Amino acid sequence: RGLGDVYKRQAHARKSIEILNAYSAMLKLIGPNDNDDPLCASLQGSMLANAAELIKHTYSKVTPAEIAGWEKMLRTVFIPVLNTFFKAKPYTNGNWGAAATKAYMAFGIFLEDEALYNQAVHFYYNGHDNGTIKNYIGENGQCQESGRDQDHVMFGLGNLAEACETAYNQGDEKMYAAFDNRLLTGYEYTAKYNLGAVSYTHLTL
């Protein structure tokens, strides 16, 4: 690659650090009285953690103090919100639990917290929420939100796929294939649903 490409990559890295530093300096709380707190913590938190992980391992000019600030933000602002979500009785459609799973995994990787990462993997397989792989996608591929709208269905599937890809990048291929390729079955059902009529069962929360 040319020097221009190198400069652009460095500029993007510096801007990413600037954004992460601004968040870690200013963000002290999510909520606590907004019903969407867990979804916000999942979606925004996973993006911040993924960006921090990339910077941490690819840009030598990031400082230990900056990384420590990002770690503190995730542990004190984002993770407590999701801890509360995971401990609560199921009360949301499954895309929330799927989003929380991918976020927990991203947090665990960046923080090098194996217990946190494993907690997310366990939830993916065995959690009580609508967002686990076997609760979100039935054996025939119908998703928990198929009777709702396709935007949320594909959002939920995408969150589960991101969790699987995260595991794959850690050397774990099993999540993609779990329950006889249940994720693939969900994608196939959803594609057929959007191409024409398919049978489905009404589901409730």
Describe the residue ranges of each PLM region.
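Carbohydrate-binding/catalytic loop surfaces
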Residues: 39-51, 88, 99, 103-105, ...
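Short, small-residue-biased leader/transition segments that mark boundaries at the very start
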Residues: 2-7, 204-205
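Extended ligand-binding groove/face enriched in aromatic
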Residues: 5-95
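Short glycine/serine- and small hydrophobic-enriched flexible loop segments
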Residues: 5, 50-57, 106-110, 158-169
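Solvent-exposed, acidic/flexible segments
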Residues: 13, 34, 38-41, 67, ...
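A structural signal for well-ordered alpha-helical segments within the folded catalytic domains
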Residues: 14-17, 21, 42-46, 98, ...
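Active-site/pore-lining binding-face segments in mid-to-C-terminal subdomains
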Residues: 143-203
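Long, well-ordered core segments of solenoidal/helical folds
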Residues: 15-31, 69-87, 115-140, 182-198
